[in-house]
Amino acid sequence: MSQFWSYRWNFQIMAANDYIIIAPNRRGLPGFGMEWLEQISGDYGGQCMKDYLSAIDDISKEPYVDTNRLGCVGASFGGFSVYWLAGHHDKRFKAFIAHDGIFNMEQQYLETEEMWFANWDYGWCILGQKQCNGTTYLCQLSPSFR
């Protein structure tokens, strides 16, 4: 769900097999300044997801795109994005492939060894907060509660 070279997600190989690849430069990717990079912190299901959906909506207008065969693939934050989009895509996609993405934000928060990162990215510490009941901040972001 972003532009980079990788052996596990090689866009050139996918394109060589007749797939149309859309890899938007969504909020949170490096190379566009710190403000752009940090716009996903505290907003995992927000503007960056709108970036993905607007890219899909734009390419879907092209006559060579079969909108009945759109898929979504990603790893890490891209994996979270795939899970999140599966619950919010308004029937845009027909298939989803997620690799090592966060499915339950509360669980990920409690199992990570990098608490500074979770506190920064989620915007606050949930320890001591009310347990997840579908209304807390992390539950609102979690694909598992959609």
What are these regions (language model features)?
Residues 5-16, 23-146:
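Active-site-proximal cap/loop segments of hydrolase catalytic domains
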Residues 1-3:
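Conserved HGGG/HGGXW glycine-rich cap/lid loop of the alpha/beta-hydrolase fold
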